[in-house]
Structures are given as structure tokens and as C-alpha cells.
Amino acid sequence: ACGSGNFLIITYKRLRELEIRIWKAMREITNVAMLPFPNISLTQFYGIELDEYACDTATLSLWLAEHQMNVKFQEELYVLPETLPLKPSGHIVCGNACRLDWNTVCPHTPEDEVYIMGNPPYLGSSMQNKEQKEDKAIALGHFKSYKDLDYISIWFYKAAEYIKDSHSKAAFVSTNSICQGEQVAMLWAPLFAMNIEISFAVTSFKWSNNAKHAAAVFCVIVGLQNKSNSSKYIISGKSRTQTNAISCYLTPETTEIIDKKSDRISSFVPKMVRGSMASD
């Protein structure tokens, strides 16, 4: 669900800016007149989008971004890379990301480093239309109680499936509901069973945009990787906490999952008639 390519464009530009800084640093360190050339190519960028018009917009936007960064490359390093004739742009595939095999869109080996990122749609189980429910059944039908999962859960599962047993990583902006309540056990238990862990997390923050009457949505950012001994980081506001593990509740030093129970935990407390769900 790359939309019109915002994530791809920003990532491409930031990498080109980093590349320029590296070339300038190499010149200063070696004091040798080198002929720089860009190594970051649009052919390294992939996206899947359902809307055909958005696909075309993403392709065109990447070409424009390439031209802008080539101009900046010339201003900083006095070399103008060739732009015309137009070379192949990013691999933007028009299709349903929930149903396509991601490895056919961007084939990779366990040794390749592929970074998946995005801002997939958030839709609670009661907000999904018939086609979206079918998407979920196809992708998550083997999950216990998959019908109660948020639509974005599909992306987390397919990303985990893609990066499993490889050097690749993934991260998504997501509704915070996947890290709260009974969705946690439904989604994260199968992901953790695939030897996947949370590499970093940004805890709940309010998502805002320029749309009129935009609903208040609280989001998280969650990174996925294969299990490793590397440090993990939890970012909350302006603070950053280093930890050895991150739970699916985005808390440090544990990966325990609290599953639902149909009976009380002690005979000394009364039976619960209804959970904490707000209802009339």
C-alpha cells in the first residue's frame, strides 16, 4: 500500500543526501580528486499499490525526485548525473498487497538486506468491507480468531513471513490497538513463533494530517527483525530506552503475552459479567 510513493520518495532523497555527504567526506579525508557518481538507483525501490492512478503518480514522483537529487548532486559535487533519456523508475506494482506474494514483487535471498516500511490502512474488524474481510481470510485464515484482528495485521504477518530467516527488516506506522487488549495474543504469538522479534518501537503518539475533520488516531511505529542479540530501543516522546527485548505491549525486557481467560483467576474474587469494553 505505497500510495503515491511518499515513503519511497522521502527514503530515496535521504539516502541520496547521505551519499553526497559520504562523497564529500571521502574527498576531504583522502585529499584526492575523485569523480563521484551516484550509487543509489530508483531500481532499488519497490512498492505495491491497489489504485492504478496512485501507481502512476508514484512512478512519476520518483522520477522527479531523482531529477531533484541529481541537481543537488551537481551543486555539491560539480558532477551532473545523466537523467535523460528516462531510465527505469522504481518497481511499482499495481495489485493487492494483501494477496500478492511479496517475494515475487521483490525477490530476495537470505543474505540480501531488504527494508520494508509503510503506513498501511488501519481498519478495525467492524469497519472492514466484504473485500477487506476476504483479504484477511486469505492472509490470516490460519490465525486463531483472525476475524477480530485489525486490517493492518495482514501487513505485519506478510512482512514477518518475508523477512523470516534473512537479514531483511520491516517497520510500519500502525494503529496502537495491535499492541493492546486481546489483539496482542492473536497477532503477536504467531509472529514470535516465527522467530521474529520487535527491533524498535515508538510508543503511542497522536497522528495528525491536513484533512478536514480528520479523526484523532493514536499510532505506534513497530520494527520487526529476526531474533538477535542486538540492543533494542523504545522511543517515547523525546526519551529513548535501550533494552534487550521489547514486548508486544511495547514495554522493555520481556516478551510475555497475556492471553484471555474465560474464568476468574481466583475463587476469592467474584465472577466478571462483562469485560472492560465500553458499551451501552
Put a short name on every predicted segment:
Residues 51:
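Conserved SAM/SAH-binding beta-strand->alpha-helix loop
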Residues 90-95:
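Conserved SAM-binding strand-loop segment of SAM-dependent methyltransferases
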Residues 24-40:
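Surface-exposed acidic, glycine/proline-enriched linker/cap segments
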Residues 17-22:
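Post-Walker A helix-loop "phosphate-sensing" segment adjacent to the P-loop in P-loop NTPases
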Residues 45-48:
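Conserved SAM-binding motif I beta-strand of class I
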